[in-house]
């Protein structure tokens, strides 16, 4: 296989769409600034919107019509309004056609949420040292682009794609 010359990069300090078209994720550089455990998600850029409610417990009920999930699935949730729920990857439980639950911090709030159900890569880090993750072969296919989910402003990422 010949060397690929059209690899590009995208640097981000906040969550958002990094690439808005079909591409392959080739590698990821993560630079945490503190030694705290973080989870950064790189998702296929397909989402569904809905609402959430947390009633003073650690159970967050998410309502999204025909979400298509099953118990045990991992999703990235971007809490777009309503309070202080943490944007990050969650494991889905108690699935019905239009609702599911995830475990969050104990809060009392409601609001809107955007779900990214197709996580391409999740990377955990627990120290303040930058590191690179090489994606082997041709990379991971992101059919609709790449959404980067950064749970904390103490992390920056650079992704390589093409």
Predicted feature locations:
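C-terminal interaction-tip segments
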Residues: 1-22, 33, 150-162
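Local beta-strand/beta-hairpin segments that build beta-sheet-rich folds
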Residues: 6, 13-20, 45-46, 117-125
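Noncatalytic modules at the cell exterior or secretory-pathway interfaces
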Residues: 26-28, 139-153
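Short, surface-exposed beta-strand/strand-loop-strand elements in extracellular ectodomains
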Residues: 35-46, 117-123, 157-162
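Small/polar beta-strand repeat architecture
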Residues: 46-118
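Exposed aromatic-hydrophobic patches
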Residues: 63, 102, 131-139
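Short proline/glycine- and polar residue-rich coil/turn motifs
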Residues: 94-95, 124-131
